[in-house]
Amino acid sequence: MKFTRRSFVKASALATAMVAAGCSPQPVAPKQNPETEGATWYKTVCRYCGVGCGVMVAAKDNRVVAVKGDTENPVNKGLLCVKGYYLDRIMNTEEGRILKPLIRKNGQLTEASWDEALDLVAARFREAIDQHGPDSVGFYGSGQNLAEETYIANKLFKGCIGTNNVEGNPRTCMASAVAGFLSTFGKDEPMGNLDDIEHADTFFIIGSNTAEAHPIIYSRITTRKQTGKDVKVILADPRRHRVADIADIFLPFRPGTDLALLNAFAQVIIEEGLHDPDFIERHTTFQDGNGAITFEQYVAFLQDYTPEKVAPITGLSPDDIRAAAREIGARGRKTMTLWCMGINQRTVGTWLNNAIYNLHLLTGKICQPGNSPFSLTGQPSACGSVREGGGLSHLLPCGRQVTNEQHRKEVAAVWGVDYTRMSDKVGYHTMEMFRAAGDGRIKALLISCTNPGHSLPNLNSVRASLEKTFLVVMDAFHNRTTELADVVLPSALWCEKEGIYGNTERRTQHLAKAVEPKGEARPDVWILLEIAKRLGYGEYFSHYTSNEVIWEEFRKMGGGGTGYDYAPYERYKQERGLRWPVNDKQPAGTTLRYVEGDDPFVPEGAGIYFYGKPDGKAVIYARPHRDPAEVPDAEYPFYLSTGRILEHWHTITMTKRVPEIMKGAGEFYCEIHEEDAARLGIQNGDLVKLTSRRGQVVATARVGGRAVPQKGLVFLLMHDDRTERLANFLTNDAVDETSKQMEYKVCAVRVEKA
């Protein structure tokens, strides 16, 4: 059979292709491999997105010989997408794998011993701290770090060195989601879970190409649509992508106008009596940018967002806006909203999250099976490691804040440090951290398990900054950041180590170690402990003899009314994850937060109680529409948005090592509407040049295909790691004023035939 992208997708059992073909997805069987005879199978979790799919790994003679979906895991029930299906490939390759410590000498990275590399790292960090103070150093981590890794890094930098310059790449993907949760409910992470999919009647998907970014979730949605009664899907997106294939209503709004659209939905819901006055009275309050307002004032605010007024802003028809609002608010039907980077990666990302919650709070469609606003997460432990672990510059573990003295005292008591050595000042957020590396404020920077030399916006500026600081990178594969490093430390990869991940539905899961690390690679925890010891903080870290010891200490950060209650490490090793809070009242975990009888922190008789707020009430916000930081003009007449395809992940550090994926996915590309292409004389497959105010790249034009942007919009894949094709040379580093998350999804470019 001829090997085409279509056959590749089908052969890989991708849910989207199977649904399009009219058949139901089935669990992926392991590839036939005689080596599995006599192998040992280990329970673990997928290394890629935030869904948290269970994976079984077969190892024999210190080699991964097979992987398969874990049929006992309730998240994926045996299904794997193409990335998970080929996880064995990334474990067995040595192409691009970092096998020894490297030190830059005479401009070249050269092999070194662990002692030489670690001593150099400690010496340069100690020099910076002693001469320029604790805020002259920083740590940039990842939603791919294990929870234990984030915990140790946090303690080292915040508890011992005394700086809050601890950031992570969840700032680039989930910070606005966090800010939305905190401002609306007072607590981070969702009240619902993935089981809501099987109960929902209406799915409202906005800012998410779920079919390609979260394919296992999409497979569950399509199964629900196929098997449920009168299940509807509404898609709101500037680009027609795979989800549109199953959408009953498709709303291709003009880029950057979705806040106006969400306000229009709220206006219709109230105008047509689809709201729930009793729920609103008992469980909500109202605010605008200046403080408390009344329901009547909120209704008055919405009069600027009638469908007729919003139609010319969004480019949609009033009738389509009303039809979608009626479906979302329909009485007797359960609505689940799902969103991801299209909402979060915006300068109004926090407000957009608020506006989504408004719809569920106005209708009372929340905290019930199937009635669920559900924020999707992009990395396997952005929640469990960074958000819950406090791995950002304003956070401490389990929802605490660095500016709160009592919080610092609580954390210091567990860490065994004097709380006065902990800074009360918020550290640099991600973009400011890299600017500080460029202008001399940060003298030494440690990066773990992420590739900012490819992934951050306004990349010309970022890469220049990385060349000016003492840069240490801990990673498993060479990438566009390791090439800039002064020291590279080889990290253990996935099932070469054990630990904890936390997924998008509050599910904490254990990853087993199946094989030893390749070459001289070491687990990140080991590396961080060695750095701590060499910096002179060994007394605070010497008791960490295993990941279990670290986890059990982290558990002490929860409990005590924080709402972050976790099970002992041993339980996670045995079970397929538990959704927190987990305690004596709810030993099996919590299905729905804020619900009496399910969430152990809801007072008796309260029914639903949003205990993150002092009055137990969620906030409905009046959030006005605001244009993106950059819109097209005569010089840069196109909108640009960036994103991903199903087969690849992030900066392809791992997926490029899989020949089947590279061959099947084909060339990376830039999508352009056929009318725009014709006007510019561009044909499918031509090279095009894209230029923004920050840089330029070339790309291969895709005219028609799996997705189609609207006229005036071009969509560029984020994955390509070739210098002349790095999408983030173009993107805007403007940030949301609350969350400090960057606006990857909307900027202005010029498009020309190359």
Swiss-Prot record:
Q: What does this protein do?
A: Catalytic subunit of the nitrate reductase complex NapAB. Receives electrons from NapB and catalyzes the reduction of nitrate to nitrite.
User: What's the name of the protein?
Assistant: Nitrate reductase
UniProt cross-references to SMART domains, sorted A to Z: Molybdop_Fe4S4
InterPro entries xref list: Asp_de-COase-like_dom_sf, CT_Nitrate-R-NapA-like, MoPterin_dinucl-bd_dom, Mopterin_OxRdtase, Mopterin_OxRdtase_4Fe-4S_dom, MopterinOxRdtase_cofactor_BS, Periplasm_NO3_reductase_lsu, Prok_molybdopt-oxidoreductase
The signal peptide, as residue positions, is 1-31
Q: How is it modified after translation?
A: Predicted to be exported by the Tat system. The position of the signal peptide cleavage has not been experimentally proven.
According to UniProt, the reaction catalysed is: 2 Fe(II)-[cytochrome] + nitrate + 2 H(+) = 2 Fe(III)-[cytochrome] + nitrite + H2O
EC number annotated for this UniProt entry: 1.9.6.1
What is one process in the GO biological process aspect for this record? nitrate assimilation
Q: Which organism is it from?
A: Symbiobacterium thermophilum (strain DSM 24528 / JCM 14929 / IAM 14863 / T)
